[in-house]
Amino acid sequence: MTGPLTAPGLTGMADAVLHEVASLAARHGETGDTAAIELTSIPLTRLDREDIVIRLGRGEVEATIDSAGRSEVWETSYAGVWLVRHLGLDGKVATETIEICAAPLILFSHPDDRRAAAARLGEDLRAKAAPAA
């Protein structure tokens, strides 16, 4: 983790949030319990949020989801600590969450979608295998 920013506009809340992340990550490693910290519900300044994001860094995994707005997901430089950012249709941050888990649920397809996709794939394969008329 890089050091904290020192600038006007920082309230010290970034340190408190990061200590909570460290505690939750340790618990996740021991018990598998998952947790989330909704950053947009905490009285953070813009600089506080930037400080948190910078200090957590970026890891090797990231994804973008385009569904009812855009969502950006990335694992931080700490395995199991993810940042999930949902943007409104105007492109502004609607919610920003730190999730402590193996992978955020937003990355998992819904069971109904998986069943429909399996059926569609089977139909596509049967149609391709059918002799041309």
Language model segments and positions:
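N-terminal domain-onset segments
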Residues: M1-D51
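Helix-rich interaction surfaces within compact, conserved domain-sized segments
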Residues: W74-A133
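Short, structured protein-protein interaction patches enriched in aromatics and acidic/basic residues
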Residues: E38-T40, L44, V61-D90
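A generic structural micro-environment signature
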Residues: T45, E50, E62, P104-I106
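Extended alpha-helical surfaces
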Residues: A22-A35, E62, A68-G69, H86-A94, ...
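Short, intrinsically disordered, mixed-charge
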Residues: I54-V61
